């Protein structure tokens, strides 16, 4: 099973990558910029595997560049908060 098929697995995967990036000294702005690029790739190239991803893809498709950046930033915050609880 791919990490994309289960929402909790996907968040855990992102949380692990986020912790690694932060441990290596990557800035929050750089992390959000990368999350925005990854979000664009996923929205355009990868089929949604669960309802949460479908909602994110739908939101992404109607969002402006600034709004996409905000969505990516919220995803970073979501996995950050999940990894601290």
UniProtKB/Swiss-Prot annotation:
InterPro entries: DUF3243 (IPR021637), Uncharacterised_YmfJ (IPR024702), YmfJ/YflH_sf (IPR038292)
Protein name: Uncharacterized protein YmfJ
Organism field: Bacillus subtilis (strain 168)
């Amino acid at each position: 099973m791919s990490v994309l098929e289960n929402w909790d697995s996907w968040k855990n995967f992102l949380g692990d990558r986020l912790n690694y990036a932060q441990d290596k000294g990557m800035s929050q702005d750089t992390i959000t910029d990368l999350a925005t690029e990854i979000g664009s790739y996923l929205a355009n190239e990868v089929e949604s595997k669960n309802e949460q991803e479908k909602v994110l893809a739908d939101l992404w498709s109607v969002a402006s560049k600034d709004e996409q950046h905000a969505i990516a930033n919220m995803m970073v915050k979501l996995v950050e908060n999940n990894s601290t609880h």
